[in-house]
Curated annotation (Swiss-Prot):
SUPFAM superfamilies: Periplasmic binding protein-like II, Porphobilinogen deaminase (hydroxymethylbilane synthase), C-terminal domain. GO terms for cellular component: cytoplasm. It holds the Pfam family Porphobil_deamC. Monomer. It comes from Natranaerobius thermophilus (strain ATCC BAA-1301 / DSM 18059 / JW/NM-WN-LF). This is Porphobilinogen deaminase.
Length: 311
């Protein structure tokens, strides 16, 4: 069997794709795999805030086009980058077991958020991270930085004014850089991005043979948790590049979901948690996500998001 896999060009994307390749070769030793590196619009717009150009699909549209045109058979994405709206003729046939979905602080002198000096400057281009950091400590100053993991880590040495940067822990794990972590940031401080920490394997809808083979990489618990998070995000009409966070986990067959919407300055924060018992009903995660989103909408979430768009 021959398989052409499409991925972004970044080192993290390649690390993630190589992990998928290793898993597939474990299950199918005779498989022949070719990796095709594809540059996306999001990779090109390094000097622009993604929230300003419309965050949805910026890191996968070109890869999806290659899939639709038959240039590749499988696309490997970070789940957090995949829009909640489905693309016709394509489907996410597997969601891999989630690596730690939380965010992490990398700081000078290896100190925590609480230990940072007054008016400390933290590097992140994420409105979600920045707004929640401001809500937690309103003296903190958010400095926009873009680029891959190494680029953003290097900013800490290159920019003397920076005291810390915030990155997804999963990326640090996959890149073998966990020694740099100063603090694993609790969802009490920053609720992570929906889907963060897992990979989504996307194929053409009619490729039944490949769908069957990729089923071995699908993790049911991750699919349920992320299903709830993405339903929450979808109801709010957001993407990974708006100040919306969602974090779900399964504890003793109970699905727990926390959702947050925050204004950019951190002054207005709406955050709630819900839980439900899991059964064989596949609609439970999406129902939970929708219900939580409706609760936040009643509390004013749409007003916060519309003001952000207008601004």
């Amino acid at each position: 069997m021959k398989l052409r896999i499409g991925t972004r060009r970044s080192q993290l994307a390649l690390d993630q794709t190589n992990w998928v390749v290793e898993q597939l070769k474990t299950h199918y030793p005779d498989i022949e795999i070719e990796i095709k590196k594809i540059e996306t619009k999001g990779d090109q717009l390094l000097n622009v805030s993604l929230s300003k150009v419309g965050g949805k699909g910026l890191f996968l549209k070109e890869i999806q086009n290659a899939l639709l045109q038959g240039e590749i058979d499988l696309a490997v994405h970070s789940m957090k980058d995949i829009p909640t709206e489905t693309t016709e003729d394509l489907e996410i046939c597997a969601i891999t077991k989630r690596v730690d979905p939380l965010d992490a602080l990398i700081s000078n002198n290896d100190i925590t958020i609480d230990e940072l000096p007054e008016n400390a400057k933290i590097g992140t281009s994420s409105l979600r991270r920045g707004s929640q950091l401001k809500a937690y400590r309103n003296d903190l100053q958010i400095i926009p930085i873009r680029g891959n993991i190494n680029t953003r880590m290097n900013k800490l040495q290159e920019l003397p004014e920076l005291d810390a940067v915030v990155l997804a822990k999963a990326g640090l794990v996959r890149s073998g850089m966990t020694d740099s972590i100063s603090q694993n940031i609790s969802p009490e401080i920053i609720v992570p991005c929906p889907g963060q920490g897992a990979l989504g394997l996307e194929i053409r809808h009619d490729n039944e043979n490949l769908k069957e083979k990729l089923a071995v990489l699908d993790d049911s618990e991750s699919r349920k948790a992320i299903g709830a998070e993405r339903a929450f995000l979808n109801r709010l009409g957001g993407s990974c590049h708006v100040p919306v966070g969602a974090y779900a986990e399964i504890i003793s067959n109970e699905l727990h979901l926390t959702g947050v919407v925050a204004s950019e300055d951190g002054q207005d924060v709406i955050k709630r948690s819900v839980q439900t018992h899991l059964s064989d009903n596949n609609k439970i995660p999406s129902t939970l996500g929708n219900d939580l989103a409706e609760e936040l909408i009643e509390l004013g979430a749409n007003k916060i998001l519309s003001e952000l768009k207008e601004g």
